[in-house]
Swiss-Prot record:
GO terms for molecular function: rRNA binding; structural constituent of ribosome. One of its GO terms (biological process) is cytoplasmic translation. The keyword Ribonucleoprotein applies. Keywords: Ribonucleoprotein, Ribosomal protein, RNA-binding, rRNA-binding. It comes from Erythrobacter litoralis (strain HTCC2594). This is Large ribosomal subunit protein uL6. PROSITE patterns: RIBOSOMAL_L6_1. PANTHER family: 60S/50S RIBOSOMAL PROTEIN L6/L9, LARGE RIBOSOMAL SUBUNIT PROTEIN UL6M. The lineage of its organism: Bacteria, Pseudomonadati, Pseudomonadota, Alphaproteobacteria, Sphingomonadales.
Amino acid sequence: MSRIGKRAVAIPSGVEAKIDNGTLTVKGPKGTLSLGLSDLIDYKIEGDEIAVNPANDTQKARSYWGMQRTLVSNLVEGVTEGFSKTLEISGVGYRAQAQGKTLKLQLGYSHDVDIAVPEGLEVKTPDQTTVIISGIDKQAVGQLAAEIRQWRKPEPYKGKGIKYQGEYVFRKEGKKK
């Protein structure tokens, strides 16, 4: 039995949810998100909460149960509060600058790296070594953060690179003579 799946997702005031044609659509103060529903799971809107239960007692349905409940929860949280990820850049000459719908990174390559910001996401650079990505879709926010980090992952000897805020970089000792 899924301990996550058996809890219903509360719908706060100001948020509207509806199910039609295999799609759950959630509207809130920050925007609208939708989720394609799985046939293995039953979704019911009961008053001010969304109940998620397996459609049958197969192993596959039970394994989807908790994940589908979390995806529904992320829709509701996204349209009410939104999501954000913070990246920290460390290294000599490494810097970032947001220019409209483009993020310009200087990461020690012979050229600047320009990353296009997808629709629905916002990128801010409060200073040259911090990048804040925010939006209502948790998957899109995490994907953009991962793509930015991919350009220079933190290296273990000096700790240079792009890392998530709060990420621990395992450090190694250099060669000894």
